[in-house]
Amino acid sequence: MSRSSPSGKGHSRMAEPRFNNPYFWPPPPTMPSQLDNLVLINKIKEQLMAEKIRPPHLPPTSASSQQPLLVPPAPAESSQAVMSLPKLQQVPGLHPQAVPQPDVALHARPATSTVTGLGLSTRTPSVSTSESSAGAGTGTGTSTPSTPTTTSQSRLIASSPTLISGITSPPLLDSIKTIQGHGLLGPPKSERGRKKIKAENPGGPPVLVVPYPILASGETAKEGKTYRCKVCPLTFFTKSEMQIHSKSHTEAKPHKCPHCSKSFANASYLAQHLRIHLGVKPYHCSYCDKSFRQLSHLQQHTRIHTGDRPYKCPHPGCEKAFTQLSNLQSHQRQHNKDKPYKCPNCYRAYSDSASLQIHLSAHAIKHAKAYCCSMCGRAYTSETYLMKHMSKHTVVEHLVSHHSPQRTESPGIPVRISLI
């Protein structure tokens, strides 16, 4: 550069300022391969610093991938558009941000993205987002909005991907960007909030799945609780299912008595009923010679000998007690003085006569002698009384069988008269 004479020193400075000299302001590079030596050294230093703070899950870069980064540009190309670092620092009043940056796109891409082209853009120092400059560089640049990053992250992004995109080939760039499924800055941050579960759908977009189970409305079963059928050993998880199953026992009674038309839900009830026909009384009283078919009947009879009356009247002033619960319930109805209509058979009381008449009709059916003997014609209110009566005919059965022409069935089977 030629300096002006002392006589025209002030005029030459005004005509040609020293900072407008092409020595300090080289033309910007037009191709990524024309990076100046200063930018190359700074990028290599920043990349080495990024290697020191690299996360432990990323392996160190191989020598083959670092070798192209250490190759300086050709002397012919660098002589036109390079300047050394000491000369730049000696110039007073020159700001650091005035250093021309390479025309390379600085976009934060995900780890699985691929580079489709060289997006050429200029990065401003104070703004994290970059814009494409289609007129300054080549005409192949495409504008892509970048993700806002912090100062440290933008420095790391500008250190390695920018330099690699200008020197290495696209296949090698893709392999470096996707080391172990992570980017150069490590694994991506996990999103806050509830994660949405997406089902894999290879033929179309991902299908959204609700991340919590949908419970059906209605009765739900409690944990660890089961309901057992009272007739059979089956168990159920809900009470409603057990009740539905219990109806099958009440409606269908498969155990039928061979001596009469009765049927029962289980075998134990049938065995208890067969004692009436067979006359078996396995429960004997220890105080007398009486025997009973059921244990409950023996217990009620034993209270007569012991004088035990466990069922006491709770009404104030009444000291009566009874051996059976049914007798106590009949006695308690006598204390209902607000119901003047009382039943003469069971001491029940009602507030009106219509209710009493309905109750008396039930007594008429209950005390009706529906069980009739086929040999002598006598009738009884219960089948038990009829069986006791039938035992008297066993002695002269062979004689009576020849003198009863109206008998239609065998003498051992009772006939029940249906009431209308």
Curated annotation (Swiss-Prot):
Listed InterPro entries: Znf_C2H2_sf, Znf_C2H2_type
Single GO MF annotation: zinc ion binding
Chain positions found as Phosphoserine: 404
One of the protein's GO biological processes: regulation of transcription by RNA polymerase II
Residues found modified as Phosphothreonine: 162
Family annotation (Gene3D superfamilies): Classic Zinc Finger (3.30.160.60)
Pfam family of the protein (one): zf-C2H2
Zinc fingers typed C2H2-type, residue spans: 227-249, 255-277, 283-305, 311-335, 341-363, 371-393
Biased composition (Low complexity): 121-154
Cross-link entry Glycyl lysine isopeptide (Lys-Gly) (interchain with G-Cter in SUMO2), positions: 198
Residue numbers spanned by region Disordered: 1-28, 54-80, 115-155, 178-202
Top-rank taxon: Eukaryota
Keywords, sorted A to Z: DNA-binding, Isopeptide bond, Metal-binding, Nucleus, Phosphoprotein, Repeat, Transcription, Transcription regulation, Ubl conjugation, Zinc, Zinc-finger
Annotated compartments: Nucleus
Annotated GO CC locations: nucleus
Alphabetized PANTHER family for the sequence: TRANSCRIPTIONAL REPRESSOR PROTEIN YY, YY2 TRANSCRIPTION FACTOR
Similarity-based family: Belongs to the krueppel C2H2-type zinc-finger protein family.
Free-text function comment from the UniProt entry: May be involved in transcriptional regulation.
Protein's UniProt name: Zinc finger protein 362
UniProt source species: Homo sapiens (Human)
